[in-house]
Design a protein with these regions (language model features):
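Extracellular glycan-associated modules
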Residues: 164-431, 452-455
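Loop/turn-rich, solvent-exposed surfaces of beta-rich toroidal or solenoidal domains
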Residues: 10-11, 35-90
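Beta-propeller domains
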Residues: 1-45
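Entry beta-strands of beta-propeller and related beta-repeat scaffolds
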Residues: 1-2, 55-62, 112-120
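Conserved blade-ending motifs and adjacent loop-strand segments that build the rim/top face
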Residues: 28-46, 84-112
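Structural motif
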Residues: 9-15, 70-80, 126-146
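Blade-level signature of beta-propeller repeat domains, shared across WD40, Kelch, NHL, RCC1
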Residues: 103-171
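Cleavable C-terminal sorting propeptides in eukaryotic secreted/cell-surface proteins
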Residues: 432-455
Length: 455
């Protein structure tokens, strides 16, 4: 693998599977995740970049500076990042805040548990106007333990998600004959929102990017065991909104967003459709791809800000549905309801490369938030993939969806507070071809010829 800083302000990662004869940009995973465009700072800090096997998992460790948004001229604090080529976590700071770091490197020694060592070497300016540089060596004992803790969490969450679709016991969709054991539902799974909700934060179970709850004037978001119920409120899961470092940059090219939802009612006459889930662009908040539900009981696909396709629903309000939106190659969008594609073919989209996705929205988009007629929407088991799932995989996921209890007391919800433990009443039923040549760092980080196989 190879990482380089480019003139467009982002660090690109390239992969080679033929001993360096050809290189392909890793747009679906690590490329363009980290920024290189901090104003008032030199072109870029050379990063440390190594691979290792820790806790029986192939991972990559990277050191790169992190800047706050408040001070454009500040010195970036060097942070350690962990990735397994699917998930990415900021482990935390390595350098001192006053250090003006210009380059860094990592050393990892494996062996028995008490012999493992992770060391960061970084070059810094001495300050006081001096042009000479100094070297610092830091033993990252606490950071290595944090790496192990994160890897343990990833493993545990993988196991939890896998149980949503048991591979044994021949769990099968009787209408399609598709068994859960035909698909590995954690393949390419980057983010997972479930029951970890408090305050205005819906936390990613993989410790990556958290979603933030937004509310209208009368909005309420209420957490329960496995998800959140929104009324006049919604969740935003940031992509471009993350700032300089965008862990979900892959979503501008390929993604699948899946959620189990229940709409506790229907829009009344004259009301706009309920915006259930979608991806909002950076330009004037245009919806790139989304799914809504109208007063006539029809599912509508929003494609490039316009309603493109519809599918009539024969179910009653409060029925549990699994919905999904899929983006392929940044130009083709599809939507699914209960494993069935809405429309016969994908809708054609303009490339997202130049504008970029701002965030995903779930449970609403703020368009009509605050209205007394807002219909509650419950969302649970929200899954974000870094690849487009095919029709078969969508059907398999649908076959394993968990039923959401019906909401019976809307007055209690309206009076509730945001956070875990709020009272809830349920019924008994249960492309990437831009030239980087002029933006290469003096030191190009080339790590031998290896690859991390996505597990």
């Amino acid at each position: 693998m190879m990482m380089t800083a480019c003139d467009d302000g982002r660090r690109r990662v390239y992969e080679s599977g033929d001993k360096g004869e050809s290189w392909t940009e890793a747009l679906g995973t690590l490329s363009r995740v980290w920024g290189n465009n901090h104003k008032g700072h030199e072109r870029g800090v050379r990063s440390g970049f190594i691979t290792a096997t820790i806790e029986e998992r192939d991972v990559m460790l990277v050191t790169l500076p992190v800047y706050s948004n408040s001070n454009e001229n500040e010195k970036g604090e060097l942070h350690l990042w962990l990735t397994d080529n699917t998930h990415i976590v900021d482990i935390g700071p390595v350098s001192e805040k006053e250090d003006d770091v210009t380059a860094s490197s990592l050393l990892y020694k494996s062996g028995e548990a008490n012999e493992e060592e992770l060391i960061a070497l970084y070059e810094k300016k001495k300050g006081d106007g001096e042009s000479s540089l100094g070297m610092v060596s830091v033993r990252l004992t606490a950071q290595l333990q944090r790496v192990k803790d994160v890897l343990t969490t990833w493993k545990e969450v993988d196991e939890r998600v896998s149980k949503l679709c048991p591979s044994e016991g021949a769990t099968e969709d009787t209408s399609t004959g598709i068994a859960c054991n035909t698909v590995k539902i954690t393949d390419g799974l980057v983010g997972f929102l479930s029951g970890n909700f408090s305050g205005n934060t819906w936390r990613d179970e993989y410790l990556g990017v958290n979603a933030t709850v937004k509310k209208g004037a009368n909005g309420v978001a209420t957490g329960y065991a496995d998800g959140v119920t929104f009324r006049g409120a919604w969740a935003e899961w940031p992509v471009g909104k993350q700032g300089e470092n965008q862990l979900y940059y892959f979503a501008n090219y390929n993604f699948t967003l899946v959620a189990t939802l229940s709409v506790h009612g229907e829009p009344t006459e004259g009301d706009t459709p309920i915006q259930l889930m979608g991806a909002t662009m950076n330009n004037k908040n245009t919806v790139l791809l989304g799914l809504s539900y109208d007063k006539e009981g029809k599912w509508q696909v929003l494609c490039g800000g316009k309603t493109a396709k519809e599918l009539r629903s024969n179910s009653d309000p409060g029925t549990t549905h699994q919905v999904a939106i899929v983006l392929q190659n940044g130009t083709q969008g599809s939507a699914y309801v209960d494993g069935q594609r809405v429309g016969d073919a994908p809708c054609e989209l303009k490339s997202t490369d130049s504008k970029g996705i701002l965030h995903f929205y779930i449970g609403g988009d703020g368009g009509s938030a605050g209205s007394k007629e807002d219909v509650p929407v419950t969302a649970t088991n929200v899954l974000l993939y870094n690849r487009p799932l095919d029709d078969n995989e969508i059907r398999v996921l649908n076959a394993s969806k968990v039923s959401i209890p019906k909401l019976t007391d809307l007055k209690t919800l309206a009076a509730g507070t945001t956070g875990v433990g709020t009272a809830r009443h349920f019924g008994a039923n249960g492309d990437g071809s831009a030239d980087c040549g002029g933006g290469l760092l003096p030191l190009l980080l080339l790590l031998g010829l290896w690859g991390i196989a996505a597990s």
